[in-house]
Structures are given as C-alpha cells and as structure tokens.
Amino acid sequence: LCYEALMCRHNSLKGIRSDVSPVHWQYGAIARLEKGEVIDKYLEKGYSTISLGYIGLYEMTKLMKDVSHTTPEGEEFALRVMKYLRAACDKWKKETGLGFALYGTPAESLCYRFARIDKERFGTIKAIILILTT
C-alpha cells in the first residue's frame, strides 16, 4: 500500500510543466528549465527522493509489546520495524531506480487526530492518554 501510494505521487508529477511553479522549476530553486518545459528529467536517476515517513513508534511498541521503545525489548522491536521499512525502501529503489528515503517525523499536527482514530479503532492503550474535547 505504501509503495502504491508513493508511486502514485511520483507518477502524478510526470508531464508537469515548469510553469506550475516558476520559482522552483524556472528561477533556480530546483532547476532552470524553459517556460513550459516538462520536469520529468528531474524525477528520475536519483535526482528526486520519494519519502516514506513513519510516526507513532512509541505508541506502536506500547500497543504491540506493552513496553516503551526505550526498554531493551521495546527498542529491539522498534528497530526491527524500522529495519523492515528501510529494507522496503531499498528494495523499491533497486526495482525502480528511483530514490526512496525513510523518515521518522515528529508530527504534532497529526498526533491528536491519529490518537483519536487509534482510540476509536483499538480502544484505550495502557500508558497512552488521550483527552478528547468534543
């Protein structure tokens, strides 16, 4: 699913012309293309990066192992998950020749929303507190 979503994003940029963002594509922020030139050559051969991001490492570890990711057991589990994601990115890069990157991101703007959705789906996870103000 992640691969399909990332490739959908990548493929949606194919055929886009530099006019879509002159600052980026014509005036040098990314490239100096002619007006109306397609950006495709900057989507291939490692010039661009397709980013897979993850958030909620603590919450995932707490839900799956009932320990923090800072404990030896939790750290081992969290590292296995991250290595799995990294291996997937490496596999996709090898298969496509495109640059894939893995990012762990603090996502404060999503925390409340995702925590609410997780609580609705999985119930209360011990040691993870969510105060809903509705």
Per-range role (PLM):
Residues L1-L63:
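Structured mid-domain segments that build the active-site/substrate or prosthetic-cofactor binding neighborhood
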Residues S12-Q26, P72-E75, K94-P106:
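Short, glycine/acidic-rich hinge or "gate" loops at secondary-structure transitions
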Residues W25-R32, M82-A88, E108-A115:
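Eukaryote-specific, cytoplasm-facing alpha-helical/coiled-coil scaffolding segments in long proteins
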Residues Y58, D66-S68, E108-R113:
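Flexible loop/turn segments at secondary-structure boundaries
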Residues T70-C89:
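Short secondary-structure subsegments characteristic of cysteine-rich extracellular domains
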Residues C8, Y84-G99:
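A structural motif corresponding to the C-terminal end of an alpha-helix
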Residues K93-T134:
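Extended amphipathic alpha-helical segments with heptad-repeat/coiled-coil character used for oligomerization
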